[in-house]
């Protein structure tokens, strides 16, 4: 009887396992780390020991969360350049892609890795980890630590996966109907030339990344670990799962293999109380508030004077108040209805019911926050996936795109008035918000579940498709197509020569010897 009670009691006891988790995030883009940071913090809250190497350390220490600053490593020289500079690099999807490759190649070099003391020390660490979490956006340099620790790893990407990321997961990314994230091609039906350029982009992206970025980083891999270790290309194909910032309300609908986990909105927390001055400014606005922010990389103060003045003119003509994230000390010509600050709690501002409009560059984190709260958006895309994000809002009736080159006082004013005064935009944004929130689990709970799943199942290799290990010509069925063409051509040739020989034979039977059919020569009389 005692034994029976013991079994009954133990059946209600849940055993919690604590894992050692390593995170390495040297890529210096705050929104990129902001996408995955909530997962890392949540894992620490659940009792796991989390060690993170990142360029944005927190001001206060968290339990179970050990943070090492790598902000001095791999610094991008172009960070916070003038907006006009970014515009020139993003003239086309191809120029955006090449610019991204150039910057990545320039920064993630062996000499910069050698200068990064925290990561060099990590290469010599004897600590045992159960899992690596890292970002593989443009660089795969952090996969060095898979060779070091021989552990399963999870990667994240702050947008829809690039072709090289989909390829390593064996995930289909068909350019015939899935537009690349640097383009503004329609989601529903691309034209012939859209599909042509889209296909060329996919080929260049995949080939360029493997030939340029991976080739450079492979030298670093071989330098530290020797020539006998697995290549970064092969390591990348061992990715357990990839957490992607994608959702069908904001991105093209794409097929996903089990290892591709969409967690768009993972960074969206419950809104916190606003600073008193901002809350007072919003609450006292009879006609509502417009929030204007160009993200963490693009600084509003770098707007050319004529662009800045266009917004100042438009803002001075509307009854709404304006919150403008302005990084400079003084905003010249600021009207009384404008409040500026170098930093603003964007997520909490967008959650306020008196915020009527969000003017943004179209970054995916800010766009998803606006969608979550049902706030219409005017998007001014500058580079990267921003144009695609705004096009998605436009297609859903929840926003409009404002081309940077079209900015003028009258154009900005007309767009603001239309999106605020026409109720269809607010209603479309509300419907989009409902669809965006309608999920079986929260994005954060989803990410936590799959992270622990990978550890429990030793890397979860059963989630991989056979496509991961297939040569490209087999994956594209080129060998099968070539064989079928060979069979078809062979059959056609057999039929052709069979008919030809048969006809010749029949002619011989009907008309006698074929030589008798030839015309006879006239004998010339002498």
Swiss-Prot record:
Pfam families: UDPGT. It is found in: Microsome membrane. Its EC number is 2.4.1.-. Residues 496-526 are cytoplasmic. The chain crosses the membrane at residues 475-495. It comes from Dactylopius coccus. Belongs to the UDP-glycosyltransferase family. SUPFAM superfamilies: UDP-Glycosyltransferase/glycogen phosphorylase. GO terms for molecular function: UDP-glycosyltransferase activity. It is a single-pass type I membrane protein. It comes from the Eukaryota. Residues 1-474 are lumenal. One of its GO terms (cellular component) is endoplasmic reticulum. It is an enzyme of class 2 (transferase). Catalyzes the transfer of a glycosyl group from a UDP-sugar to an acceptor molecule. InterPro entries: UDP-glycosyltransferase, UDP_glucos_trans, UDP_glycos_trans_CS. Glycans are attached at residues 49, 124, 283. Keywords: Endoplasmic reticulum, Glycoprotein, Glycosyltransferase, Membrane, Microsome, Transferase, Transmembrane, Transmembrane helix. This is UDP-glycosyltransferase UGT5.
């Amino acid at each position: 009887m005692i034994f029976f009670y013991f079994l009954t009691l133990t059946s209600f006891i849940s055993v919690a396992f604590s894992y050692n988790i390593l995170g390495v995030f040297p890529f210096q883009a705050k929104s990129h780390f902001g996408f995955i940071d909530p997962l890392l913090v949540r894992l620490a809250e659940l009792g796991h020991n989390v060690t993170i190497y990142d360029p944005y350390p927190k001001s206060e220490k968290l339990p179970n969360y050990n943070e090492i600053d790598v902000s001095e490593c791999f610094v991008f020289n172009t960070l916070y350049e003038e907006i006009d500079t970014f515009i020139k690099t993003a003239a086309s999807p191809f120029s955006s892609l090449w610019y991204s490759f150039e910057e990545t190649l320039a920064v993630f070099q062996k000499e910069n890795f050698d200068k990064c003391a925290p990561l060099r020390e990590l290469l010599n660490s004897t600590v045992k980890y159960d899992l690596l979490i890292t970002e593989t956006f443009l660089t795969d340099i952090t996969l060095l630590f898979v060779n070091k620790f021989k552990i399963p790893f999870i990667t994240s990407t702050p947008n829809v996966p690039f072709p090289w990321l989909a390829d390593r997961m064996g995930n289909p990314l068909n350019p015939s109907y899935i537009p690349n994230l640097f383009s503004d091609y329609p989601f529903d039906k691309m034209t012939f030339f859209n599909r042509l350029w889209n296909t060329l982009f996919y080929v260049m992206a995949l080939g360029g990344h493997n030939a340029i970025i991976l080739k450079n980083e492979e030298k670093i891999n071989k330098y530290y670990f020797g020539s006998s270790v697995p290549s970064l290309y092969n390591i990348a194909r061992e990715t357990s799962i990839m957490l992607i910032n994608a959702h069908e309300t904001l991105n093209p609908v794409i097929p996903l293999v089990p290892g591709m986990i969409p967690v768009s909105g993972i960074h969206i927390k419950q809104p916190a109380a606003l600073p008193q001055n901002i809350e007072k400014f919003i609450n006292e606005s009879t006609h509502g508030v417009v929030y204007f922010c160009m993200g963490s990389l693009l600084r509003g103060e770098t707007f050319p004077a004529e662009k800045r003045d266009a917004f100042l003119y438009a803002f001075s003509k509307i009854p709404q108040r304006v919150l403008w994230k302005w990084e400079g000390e003084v905003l010249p010509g600021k009207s009384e209805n404008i409040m500026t600050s170098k930093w603003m709690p964007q997520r909490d501002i967008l959650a306020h019911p008196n915020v009527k409009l969000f003017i943004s560059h179209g970054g995916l984190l800010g766009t998803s926050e606006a969608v979550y709260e049902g706030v219409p958006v005017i998007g001014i895309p500058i580079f990267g996936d921003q144009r695609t994000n705004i096009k998605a809002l436009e297609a859903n009736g929840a926003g409009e795109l404002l081309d940077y080159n079209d900015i003028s006082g009258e154009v900005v004013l007309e767009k603001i008035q239309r999106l605020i005064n026409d109720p269809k935009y607010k209603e479309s944004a509300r419907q989009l918000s409902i669809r965006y929130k309608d999920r079986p689990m929260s994005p954060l709970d989803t990410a936590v579940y799959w992270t622990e799943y990978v550890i429990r199942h030793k890397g979860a290799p059963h989630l991989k498709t056979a496509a991961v290990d297939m040569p490209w010509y087999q994956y594209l069925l080129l060998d099968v197509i070539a064989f079928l063409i060979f069979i078809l051509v062979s059959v056609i040739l057999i039929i052709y020569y069979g008919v030809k020989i048969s006809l010749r034979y029949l002619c011989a039977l009907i008309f006698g010897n074929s030589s008798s059919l030839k015309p006879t020569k006239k004998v010339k009389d002498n």
